[in-house]
């Protein structure tokens, strides 16, 4: 767990940690931490006739992998019966396109929606994927 905490802090979590420590009251901090500890790190959903596996980073049985690992564009499908929808890995690394505004990437049973919103590049944007029809929206 220490490794995950360190990674989280190095990836921008330190400002959240400071806010929890210095801005929130102990009661508020405990409520937030309790709430976050009850959330799943992945879940399966069915929309229309499609099934999806939604996960932050990578489909896996290992909880650390679900938060920190990065899929590769040529990975075989993770599931036979559902599409994995991931973030964490900016889509430019999946597409190899470092010159265009980041766009949702569609692979073999995998969709990456991380369009770099948290990065500093001018090409970043927030993406939303409507699961009903896979229509993409950008801000």
Task: Please tell me what each predicted stretch does.
Residues 67-139:
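Conserved beta-sheet core of the metallophosphoesterase superfamily
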Residues 48, 57-60, 89-90:
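Histidine- and/or cysteine-centered catalytic micro-motif in compact active-site loops
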Residues 2-5, 10, 57-78:
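Active-site-proximal segments of metal-dependent phosphoesterases and phosphodiesterases across multiple
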Residues 1, 45, 63, 95, ...:
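Active-site-proximal flexible loops/turns
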Residues 43-45, 130-131:
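Conserved hydrophobic "DFG−1" position in protein kinase catalytic cores
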């Amino acid at each position: 767990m220490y490794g995950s905490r360190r990674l989280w802090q190095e990836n921008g979590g330190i400002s959240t940690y400071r806010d929890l420590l210095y801005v929130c009251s102990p009661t508020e901090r405990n409520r937030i931490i309790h709430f976050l500890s009850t959330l799943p790190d992945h879940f399966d959903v069915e929309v229309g006739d499609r099934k999806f596996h939604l996960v932050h980073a990578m489909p896996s049985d290992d909880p650390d992998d679900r938060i920190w690992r990065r899929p590769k564009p040529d990975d075989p499908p993770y599931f036979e019966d559902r599409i994995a929808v991931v973030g964490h890995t900016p889509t430019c690394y999946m597409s190899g396109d470092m010159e265009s505004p980041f766009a949702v990437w569609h692979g073999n049973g995998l969709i990456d929606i991380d369009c770099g919103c948290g990065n500093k590049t001018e090409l970043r944007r927030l993406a939303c994927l409507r699961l009903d029809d896979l229509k993409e929206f950008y801000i």
